[in-house]
Amino acid sequence: MKQIVYVASPESQQIHVWQMDNQGALTLLQVVDTPGQGQPMVIHPARTHLYIGVRPSFGVVSYRIDEKGLLTEAGMAPLPGSPTQLTTDLQGETLYSVSYSGSCLSVSPIDEQGIVGAPTQTLEGLTHCHSANVDTTNQVLWVPCLQEDRIRLYTIGEAGHLTPRTPEALDSVAGAGPRHMVFHHGGGYAYAINELSGTVNVIAIDAAGAGPRIVQTLDIMPAGFSDTRWAADIYITPDGRWLYCCDRTASVISRFAVSEDGGVLRLLGHQATESQPRGFNIDSQGRFLVAAGQKSHHIAVYAIDAQSGALDPLARYAVGQGPMWVSVLAR
């Protein structure tokens, strides 16, 4: 299986394209200059296109991915606010973009050629929304709003159109600052990382038919940590056994064991990583983790131990300036 790693570095306005071999070693294939500061990326479910949000001219760039994993720009469409995170629905027909600074969420069509068009719907007043997350049924969009301390919930309708659900939101603890999310492959649980409190919530998606409910909250920080918490990203391995979170102040990745049904997390330890890890990702087989250091201007590759989930450092690679986002393509 061929795997390609894409790293977005907004300060140098670049995407570095790497091929990953079966041992986790990377070979640089391409450096793409982006039309502006590119930050959030997402790969089309069909693995034919990569999308990146850019600023200061707010927009999303569509890139075609060839058989080698190389990128060719294929189009650009406007966005209503500075893009913070992008996602697509599971069919690859709609792209959702959230803007933290603009406190808005936009819905954009993806045509049959895989090119993103102009937004057809914009929801405003989502105070400091930080991500949009499509559930495993492709029917519900979860939108953590950091300053509101809640996750808003929307039903996904025809052409990706969004309507508020009932209940319309899941409240977090005051001051938590919900940021990013992932879902357990079984569909019963979700996990949300809280930026300001440095915690992770386990969410029962439909607790006894009454809607979502937080069933566990765990600290992601090392014992005795007393500095400002600044949690950033969260990912789970494809088999649902291991979950990872990162914090930018401590520059660590925390590791959790996930119960078989997904409903319980257990903190196992912490791995020191690149300075200010804004983003990371896991390969499609759950064997490797790639973390980007926003201040170190490097990425680090770790092997994931199949028995313990522990991270074994393999190598570091220089990338562009201020890397913030990592996406992994499997072919």
Curated annotation (Swiss-Prot):
Pathway: Carbohydrate degradation; pentose phosphate pathway; D-ribulose 5-phosphate from D-glucose 6-phosphate (oxidative stage): step 2/3. InterPro entries: 6-phosphogluconolactonase_YbhE, Cycloisomerase_2, Lactonase_7-beta_prop, N2O_reductase_N, WD40/YVTN_repeat-like_dom_sf. This is 6-phosphogluconolactonase. NCBIfam families: PRK11028.1. Gene3D superfamilies: YVTN repeat-like/Quinoprotein amine dehydrogenase. One of its GO terms (cellular component) is cytosol. It comes from Sodalis glossinidius (strain morsitans). It catalyses: 6-phospho-D-glucono-1,5-lactone + H2O = 6-phospho-D-gluconate + H(+). Its EC number is 3.1.1.31. Keywords: Carbohydrate metabolism, Glucose metabolism, Hydrolase.
